[in-house]
Amino acid sequence: RQMCIRDRFTDVENFRKKIDSSYKSNRTKRKPCGFKRLLNWAKTEFECIRMPQLEADDVLGILSTSGCYTNFVLVSPDKDMEQIPCRIYNLKEEFTQTPEQAEYKLYEQCLSGDPVDGYSGIKGIGKKKAQSILNNKEGTYWDTVLKAFKDHGYKEADALKQLRLAKILHSDNWDYARERPILFTP
């Protein structure tokens, strides 16, 4: 069974824009010629899923952790998919992302930010520095991340905001009855 879940299936309303109105505001590039036609073709050939207020990444995270699907491979070159504990093919290699590795990736992205998605993390901290901080953690990852934010002059609210912007939702972050996200709290 094949499914097509693509950014253009992202809902018009995005819950992250309620957390930070500048989220993804840096994206102004137009889609390539023929993109809409390709998208319409995909909608006729594959099962396509859209969920209210969510990006395609979140839909993948929720479906992949819901228990409804087994023996699948998530195919995407997007590094954000590494927050999802499942089998992944990133167009270079296939690997299994454990829950522990997925959690680590979330906190790494919280520290380093993601300029493509438009959230900053801690200014001056990139992937390598974020990994160094996490590899020397004391307590939980959240404790370590919170300390790093405070050490750089930020408040707890800043750290939580970055974490919620970074977090790819899993099934336990989705209110199925009300069809809305449950904001992640560490």
Give each language-model segment a name:
Residues 1-5:
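Short, small-residue-biased leader/transition segments that mark boundaries at the very start
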Residues 7-13, 18-19:
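Short loop/turn segments at strand-loop or loop-helix junctions that form parts
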Residues 22:
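Contiguous, small/hydrophobic- and glycine-enriched helical/loop subdomains that border
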Residues 25-186:
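Extended two-metal-dependent nuclease catalytic cores across DNA- and RNA-processing enzymes
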